[in-house]
Each structure stands twice: as C-alpha cells, then as structure tokens.
Amino acid sequence: NGCYKDSGDRLIEELENLLNQNIQIKKVTLIGHSYGGILVTHLLNNWKNTVTLDAHIIASPLQGNTSLNTLCGYKPEVNLKPMANLFEWRTQQDLDSAFKDLPKNPQNIAISGSFVTVLPDTYKGHRLGHNWSISWVADQLKKP
C-alpha cells in the first residue's frame, strides 16, 4: 500500500534471521535517507534484539506529514532502546529542495538520546541539499 510498516516489519524479520544465523555479529548499522528514515525509525521502535543497532537517518521528515500520518498511521516519535544509537543528519531547510517550501522543517523533532548534526552549506563545491546529503554523511562515516 505504499506505507512503511510492511517493509519495516520485513526488514526486522530479515535482520533477525540474519543475526540468528550469524551469532558472531555484534553490531548492525543502518542508513535511511529521506523517507527511508521513516522506515529506520519503525525498526528502532520495534527492535527487540540485544545486538547493538546504529541508525543513521539523513534528511528525513521525521515529523511526518498529513498523508503519512493519516494514511499510514505514522506517529512522529522514536523510543530508543538501550542497545540502539540514533544519529540524525539534518540538512538546512532553505537548502533542501524537498523541504524548502514547507512552513516548518519536518526534520526537527526532539528524540531523547539522539545525536543531531546539522549539515553545512556546501559539499565539494555543491549546495548541500537533499541528495548531496548522502555523500556528505558517507564521507563523515568513513573517517577514522
């Protein structure tokens, strides 16, 4: 139906199967960009495994919107479990083509325990907007 729950539940199931078959895995790292961040927050809210989960959410409208909230039952809340770490990478609203015309920044949400980074204006000579945000974060994550 285009909503995130079925895909999110499938992702949880597949990760659980992978972890059950590979007990040596001690940490899972997920990256969700834009609406992929909604999927990752669903996983965060429903994670029951004891394996550490690092979730990186990039330029994601975690406040939701009318259709997401109404049609899909999305609630803009994330409850981090002790074994989960959330890293929010937020674009500047006026530079993000997906968010710049909205009355308020849909990335702004208070999540207890989350680490928030607001991205700079530019990346390698480009306006650091919605799409370039993935590359910028990837560069940050590969730093030692």
List PLM regions with ranges:
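Active-site nucleophile loop of the alpha/beta-hydrolase fold
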Residues: N1, A55-T66, T91-D94
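Active-site catalytic motif of lipid deacylating hydrolases and related acyltransferases
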Residues: N1-K26
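A general structural motif
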Residues: Q24-K27, T50-T52, M83
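Structural recognition of the beta-strand scaffold that forms the well-ordered cores
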Residues: T29-I31, D54-I58, L86-R90
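Gly/Ala-rich beta-loop-alpha elbow adjacent to hydrolase catalytic centers
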Residues: I31-T41
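Active-site signature of alpha/beta-hydrolase-fold catalytic machinery across serine-
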Residues: H42-N46
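Flexible "cap/lid" loop of the alpha/beta hydrolase fold
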Residues: P61-N79
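C-terminal catalytic-base region of ester-bond hydrolases, centering on the histidine
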Residues: Y74-P144
